[in-house]
């Protein structure tokens, strides 16, 4: 049975240890924050379509594994970001496509994800692709060589969660401190 997006986020982050997480804007970030807040999580508050590009830059800047929680609408807005990530081929990057086939944050308008196989697109670019169906065993993605593209179909809709009560400066300052602390060891 297809998971709610918040359930998928909970299962994915539940098996992470010290990985850095970049989360797509809007409800995905709010859902992650409500499940498990951490200085290792960068909550996007704007810049739709840029989560994977930010994750790529972070992955290239240090050795720690980077997990990007992105949506189909966001990825479709910036396919060039996937091309660049594949060309740079960082072994520590996992892009998770939480595919609900809509722009849930802006009113659930349909995307073209139901007619375009984004996993096949990512594979054609050079990603190691894993597709999850009913069983989201994210340890499988963590065991793969990167860059990894993990396709996770989820139900449309948003969980009823509060807004993030951190301002943008707090989010970035604590995230930078976390990244710098790991790279200075």
Swiss-Prot record:
Family recorded in the similarity comment: Belongs to the TPP enzyme family.
Keywords: Coenzyme M biosynthesis, Decarboxylase, Lyase, Thiamine pyrophosphate
GO biological process per UniProt: coenzyme M biosynthetic process
GO molecular function term, any single one: thiamine pyrophosphate binding
Assembly behavior: Heterododecamer composed of 6 subunits alpha and 6 subunits beta.
Cofactor note text: Binds 1 thiamine pyrophosphate per subunit.
Chemical reaction(s) catalysed: 3-sulfopyruvate + H(+) = sulfoacetaldehyde + CO2
Organism of this sequence: Methanothermobacter thermautotrophicus (strain ATCC 29096 / DSM 1053 / JCM 10044 / NBRC 100330 / Delta H) (Methanobacterium thermoautotrophicum)
InterPro entries: Sulfopyruvate_deCO2ase_bsu, THDP-binding, TPP_dependent_decarboxylase, TPP_enzyme_TPP-bd
Protein name as it appears in the record: Sulfopyruvate decarboxylase subunit beta
Upper lineage: Archaea, Methanobacteriati, Methanobacteriota, Methanomada group, Methanobacteria
Swiss-Prot/TrEMBL cofactor(s): thiamine diphosphate
Enzyme Commission number(s): 4.1.1.79
